Amino acid sequence: MATTWLVTVSLPLAFVVTTLMVTLHSSVQHEVLHGHPFANRHLNEALVFLPLGMVFPYGRFRDTHLEHHRDEHLTDPYDDPESNYLDPKVWAGLSWARRRLLRANNALLGRMLFGPALSVWRFARADAAAIRAGDRAILRDWLLHFAGLVPVVWWVWQAPMPGWAYAIAAYAGFSLLKVRTFLQHRAHDLARGRPVIVEGQGL
């Protein structure tokens, strides 16, 4: 509705609604990979097969996120695929500009502005290397992703909403997700000290 009817009323309003829907879709993907809402995995995954966020293959998100949930690996810069931490030796070898960018990414505004692009770059680079090394499972997930992109791109192509507006809304949706994950984990010597529990309600 946001990309078809609402955009004819107000592009900014349609942009906001599309952003929220992309965010909600990603949140539903997160619930699906944890086995909700149905007992049948295939039925669950059918709900989120189409990549409305356009960037990440669901299968790769599922596998890397479940790996991330292994407590002994949490925040480890080598073993946690979602870690924002770096080995001190790796950090020491980075350029000044790269360090500034990563420092900005450690602030909430920077995480929202730069975090999605940094995540996509790191994720795609690692998967490309794995595919070149012969990982057929990762290749399969990307091929399924591209197949799912076909109807999404077709829909956006024929919809009144400009393609650039949808692409920015998809990025903005990812930015909103970065708010939730910003203070989700912290560095700690013990695995049990790494998850962050936010005790409160509302915003």
Question: Would you name each region that the model predicts?
Answer:
Residues A39-R41, D87-K89, R125-A128, H188-G193:
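Short alpha-helical linear motifs
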Residues M1-L24, V28, P51-A167:
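Non-catalytic, topology-defining segments of multipass membrane proteins
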Residues S26-G35, F61-H73, R180-D189, L203:
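Histidine-centered catalytic micro-motifs
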Residues Y166-L203:
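Extended hydrophobic/aromatic segments used for targeting, binding, or gating
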Residues F38-A39, R62, A92, V198:
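Generic, ordered loop/turn and secondary-structure boundary motif
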Residues G35-F49:
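Membrane-interface motifs of alpha-helical transmembrane segments
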Residues L43-N44, E82, L108, Q158, ...:
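Residues in and immediately flanking transmembrane alpha helices
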